[in-house]
Structures are given as structure tokens and as C-alpha cells.
Regions:
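An N-terminally biased module of ancient metal coordination in phosphate/nucleic-acid-related enzymes
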Residues: 1-81
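Active-site gating/metal-coordination segments in enzymes
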Residues: 2-11, 79-149
Length: 149
């Protein structure tokens, strides 16, 4: 499947500079994303933007280059509630990543457990209008009540 990148979206930059300081042991990049690749993990039809592909391999290489030990991978809004790219990245992270998923009220308890088993430890509620459509408060509260510690 071919996706045309939203105008103004920057391409992946393969040559980032390394920080001049050394991160402390155990440093975590606490908010990062994987985008696609769209051919394998299609972007959601309801998305508000289409990014360039930024794979798990690119993310992990960047993490290591910058000196982080771990990542928290947050579900990108362009993937909607299809968390396959996130779960795939977590499964290939060698235990060095945890995830934050986006879910709908129709998610089953088995799906919640499966994501937990993959390393998902949180659910994202996004209120940024330029990124997502409105979600009714009762739906958010229903989802929140189903998330177990």
C-alpha cells in the first residue's frame, strides 16, 4: 500500500548528531513513536496526517546512538487504535521498551491482556484536535475503568 506523506512533514534524518553530554545509566526516552512502515502496518483511514515511515529498527538505532538504555513507545495517532506496529516494535525490543497503546471501547479483555503481555503499560487518551477526532467522556471513562493494575 502506498501512502503519500503529508506536506511539511520532515523526512527521516539518517545522520543525527550525538549529544555532547553523556546520559546517565538507565536513561529512558519516555515518548517516541514508530511510523509504519505503511506497507506492513497501514495508517488509519481517519488519520489527520501521514508521516514518512520510521521503523522500529530506525528507532532502536537512534536510541542506541543517543545513549538511551530504553524507550517508551507511544502509539502514533496516525495508526489510530491499530496497535500492531507498536506491539511488533515491543516484541523486537529485547526487553528494552514498554508501550502506551490507543484503544477503543470495543477492545476485549483478551486484547488488553495480550498487549500487557507484549509490554504495553498504559493507554493514551489524546485530546489534541489537530491529531484526533473527539472521543466522548463516557467512552474514555469506560476504557479507564477496564484497565487493571
Amino acid at each position: 500500500m502506498q501512502f503519500e506523506k503529508t506536506p511539511g512533514w520532515l523526512d527521516w534524518y539518517a545522520g543525527p548528531s550525538k549529544p555532547q553530554f553523556v546520559l546517565p545509566a538507565g536513561a529512558v526516552d519516555a515518548h517516541c513513536h514508530v511510523f509504519g512502515p505503511g506497507a506492513q502496518f497501514p495508517y488509519a483511514p481517519e488519520r489527520k496526517y501521514t508521516p514518512c515511515d520510521a521503523s522500529k529498527e530506525q528507532l532502536f538505532a537512534l536510541r542506541d546512538h543517543l545513549g538511551f538504555e530504553k524507550n517508551v513507545i507511544v502509539q502514533a495517532t496516525c495508526h489510530g487504535a491499530d496497535n500492531r506496529a507498536l506491539v511488533d516494535a515491543l516484541s523486537r525490543s529485547e526487553g528494552r521498551a514498554r508501550g502506551v497503546a490507543t484503544v477503543k471501547r470495543s477492545i476485549s479483555d483478551a486484547e488488553i491482556q495480550s498487549m500487557h503481555d507484549a509490554g504495553v503499560r498504559g493507554v493514551r487518551f489524546n485530546f489534541v484536535k489537530r491529531l484526533v477526532d473527539f472521543t466522548p467522556k463516557d467512552e474514555l471513562l469506560e476504557i479507564a475503568s477496564r484497565i487493571k493494575a
